[in-house]
Amino acid sequence: MAITKYLVSALAVAGLAFAKDCAGDLTIENQQDVSTLSSCEKWDGDIVISEVVKSSISLTGVKQITGSLKAKNSSITELSAPNLNSIGDALSLSTCTALRSLDLSSLTKVKTLSLEALPKLQALGFTRTVSQATSILITNTDLTSLQGLDLETVGDFMVTNNPHLMEINVNKMTNITGYLNFAANNKQLSVKFPNLEGAHNMTFRNVSDASLPSLHKMDGLLGFYSNFFMNISAPNLTATGDLVFTSNSAVMNISMPKLETVKGGLQLANNSLLEDIEGFPALKLITGALDITGKFKTVKLPSLKEVRGDANLQSTETFGCDPWQKLKDSDVIRGKLTCRERQEKPKTGDDHSGGDEEGHKGAAAAFAKAPAAALLIAFVGALQFFL
């Protein structure tokens, strides 16, 4: 009995010692510091790569980090953790301008992924693919694709200022609960979400293709700004918040055949090759403002029953204002109607302050939010190179 008690006590003490040795916040300044992890499959705390590191670091053995794995302003050249499969909090690599190789070949789960100002990093190094993450930020890298990300759902998904990023294809993603923003990547960037069914806010800027064949419902803004595609389609979209198409210089066709409700404003502005606006045959309700300006010759919304805000239609061409006046006279358009043909400089609505009892404001304010956020993210990302 005494021997049994002794063994139990010894094992308990050993367990506590082991737990203590594999816990806390660890700062790594060289490869020798990694020896602290040599007997730890699980590290309970954060691991931080110091700014003084100027070579490669290999975290062999550790399989799980309950906290974060971080590096900021470090001169690390290679980071390897081939056995690491889970990071409980953040994988954050920021302003590591010498980092050229990332090997996290077993990683499948991380809470937040943040890769910022990594100008030499060309591949993610997620061989098994990361399938769980709540937030992703990738900005100012040399990545050519996002191969290694295979998420089904995500919160925020920000990808900006990656000059060689040519393709984003997230096959399994079905839902985006936060804000998605793609901006200022390679001009040939093709974005494909073949199975995405729902999203909160999404903005696409400077992309050559955006494929959303399964998108069914948006809760917030769906915006397309300064893109290079000729055609854009969301064949299964039935409802969205604000819907914006601005300064898409090559677009000639917009098709959303099942869209019935815009809970906010609908704006099409400065799409210089868009002559015929006929891609919304089922649209019935716009709770905010309707704002269409450009060089269009045709506007057809045959199912429209209600516009709760103002309606502004201005074109350099003749498109016919009589049908719109009839909609105003029949109270389909609840706010102010501005309809002008053959305008040298068509103007967008100055103050689309319409909306419904739920507080949906008109186009002008809502349309400005996402572009401003995108520009701020892009600016902050670029600024990191100089800090």
UniProtKB/Swiss-Prot annotation:
Residues 338-362 are annotated as: Disordered. Residues 365-387 form a propeptide. GO terms for cellular component: cell surface; extracellular region; fungal-type cell wall; plasma membrane; side of membrane. Gene3D superfamilies: Ribonuclease Inhibitor. Residues 338-361 have a biased composition (Basic and acidic residues). It is a lipid-anchor; GPI-anchor. Glycans are attached at N73, N175, N201, N206, N231, N236, N253, N270. Its main location: membrane. Residues 1-19 form the signal peptide. It is found in: Cell membrane; Secreted; Secreted, Cell wall. InterPro entries: CWI-Assembly_Regulator, LRR_dom_sf. GO terms for biological process: fungal-type cell wall organization. Keywords: Cell membrane, Cell wall, Cell wall biogenesis/degradation, Glycoprotein, GPI-anchor, Lipoprotein, Membrane, Secreted, Signal. The GPI-anchor is attached to the protein in the endoplasmic reticulum and serves to target the protein to the cell surface. There, the glucosamine-inositol phospholipid moiety is cleaved off and the GPI-modified mannoprotein is covalently attached via its lipidless GPI glycan remnant to the 1,6-beta-glucan of the outer cell wall layer. The keyword Glycoprotein applies. The keyword tRNA-binding does not apply. A lipid is attached at A364 (GPI-anchor amidated alanine). Belongs to the SPS2 family. PANTHER family: RECEPTOR PROTEIN-TYROSINE KINASE, SPORULATION-SPECIFIC PROTEIN-RELATED. Required for proper cell wall integrity and for the correct assembly of the mannoprotein outer layer of the cell wall. This is Cell surface GPI-anchored protein ARB_01627. It comes from Arthroderma benhamiae (strain ATCC MYA-4681 / CBS 112371) (Trichophyton mentagrophytes).
